[in-house]
Design a protein with these regions (language model features):
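C-terminal binding/interaction regions
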Residues: 1-28, 34, 38, 46-47, ...
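Structured beta-strand/loop patches that form or line metal/cofactor-binding pockets in enzymes
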Residues: 25-71
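Active-site- and interface-proximal helix/loop "cap" or "latch" segments in soluble metabolic
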Residues: 52-54, 63-132
Length: 157
């Protein structure tokens, strides 16, 4: 049975090809261990965030280079729907190569736009946008963890 048979044609058609591909074949799913980070001369950052509204949760792993604060690698584990997996996967990809201060500027809109097939067509149906918000929130949590500050202080910056 195909995913289309399970989800139903009309709803399934509201997802971009990129979202469908990332649901089925996420590129950055996994974890970074302490020894992996050490090989990159990086600090390991692990942050968790959950969306109580739907029961989805994501754990984000960053390997942050000690001297430059550049995110050398990013991985995630996600518990939830396919949209949460796709959003988490794209979010991890967007973080790689950025400094922590640059990564915290990634918004849920950036994540959603990166999943689009066409610039003017949303990647997911409106009722699934909260998944990209969860990706945004876990980036803020990882940044706060790395900097040793309360997440609320990042909203004030």
């Amino acid at each position: 049975m195909a995913k289309n048979d399970l989800v139903g044609g009309a709803l399934f058609d509201q997802y971009s090809n990129k979202v469908n591909e990332r649901m089925d074949n996420p590129l950055f799913r996994g974890e970074i261990r302490e020894d992996d980070a050490e090989k990159l001369n990086a600090d390991l950052v692990v942050a968790d965030f959950g969306a109580e509204s739907c029961g989805d949760a994501v754990r984000l792993y960053w390997a942050v280079e000690k001297e430059t604060q550049v995110i050398k690698d990013a991985k995630f584990k996600s518990f939830g729907c396919g949209t949460a997996i796709a959003s988490s996967d794209v979010m991890a990809e967007l973080c790689i190569g950025k400094t922590v201060d640059e990564a915290v500027l990634i918004t849920n809109i950036d994540v959603e736009k990166a999943m689009r097939d066409h610039p003017d067509e949303p990647a997911v149906p409106p009722q699934k946008m909260h998944c990209s918000v969860m990706a945004y929130d876990v980036i803020k949590k990882a940044t706060a963890t790395y900097k040793g500050v309360d997440i609320a202080t990042l909203d004030d910056a």
